[in-house]
């Protein structure tokens, strides 16, 4: 009897996601991950998945930052086939596939999907996006169906199934041995690791000295950095499977 109840619950959860139109992936800060139909990089975006067995018209739906349907952006007149993904650019352009709002990259970002005045899916209480070009989306099940479990993706898949490697854990931040500020003389800036409890081995620091966001290809930190000219040192922790 217990096994039967668990099976029924699993099927009900699957139906709740894959039998409806849902939000499947978002990006709060898009620097250069995806280019829109205007050949520009939208500030943020939301991916919607048609999990029903029939085509839908997006004009029956709205997308917004609160649970107030009257303030939500009406989606354009576009037919979306069953099993198809579509990306809405959130950049305040308010035309075509471009919504009249942008997602907040800080804490407590919300996204609500409406059909008529009813909320049919939503994401609330989001944390600050760990870094630009990081997506937050539903994980895929082994059978190729979307799940109710959300995670971060270092390799976003706008307009496609979320098959990229998930990064469920977020690393801390490196600690400088001096406070931020302007210094007139040369000095060493020593970076030390600040690793969350339970982090795996292999965590390392990469940094830049031109103010840009460190990436996996940035210089690997191994010894104190000497800043000899005006510049901005930025550092970030990296570890496979983490962000």
Question: What are the roles of these predicted feature ranges?
Answer:
Residues 5-7, 52, 192:
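Residue-level detector of intrinsically disordered/flexible regions characterized by low predicted structural confidence
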Residues 18-147, 217:
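Activation on beta-sandwich/Ig-like modules and their edge loops
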Residues 8, 35-37, 100-102, 125, ...:
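Residues embedded in well-ordered secondary-structure elements
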Residues 4-15:
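Sec-dependent N-terminal signal peptides
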Residues 4, 47, 61, 185-189, ...:
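Generic alpha-helical hydrophobic packing signal
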Residues 79, 88, 131, 137-243:
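Short, compositionally stereotyped local motifs that mark structural "simplifiers"
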């Amino acid at each position: 009897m217990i096994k039967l109840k668990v099976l029924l619950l699993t099927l009900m959860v699957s139906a709740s996601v894959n039998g409806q139109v849902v939000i499947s992936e978002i990006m709060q800060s898009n620097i250069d991950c995806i280019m829109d139909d205007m050949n520009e990089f939208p500030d943020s975006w939301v991916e919607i998945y048609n999990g029903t067995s029939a085509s839908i018209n997006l004009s029956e739906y709205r997308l917004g930052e609160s649970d107030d349907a009257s303030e939500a952006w009406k989606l354009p007149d576009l037919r979306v086939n069953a099993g198809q993904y579509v990306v809405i650019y959130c950049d305040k352009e308010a035309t075509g596939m471009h919504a009249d709002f942008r997602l907040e990259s800080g804490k407590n970002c919300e996204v609500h999907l409406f059909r008529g005045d009813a909320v049919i899916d939503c994401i609330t209480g989001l944390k600050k996006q760990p870094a630009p070009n990081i997506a937050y989306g539903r994980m895929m099940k082994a059978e190729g169906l979307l799940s109710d479990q959300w995670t971060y993706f270092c390799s976003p898949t706008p307009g496609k199934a979320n098959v990229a490697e998930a990064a469920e854990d977020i690393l801390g931040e490196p600690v400088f041995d001096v406070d931020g500020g302007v210094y007139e003389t040369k000095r060493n800036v020593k970076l030390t690791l600040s690793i969350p409890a339970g982090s795996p081995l292999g965590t390392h620091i990469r940094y830049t000295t031109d103010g840009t966001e460190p990436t996996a290809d940035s210089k690997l930190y191994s010894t104190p950095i000497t800043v000899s000219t005006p510049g901005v040192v930025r550092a970030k922790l990296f570890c496979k499977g983490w962000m």
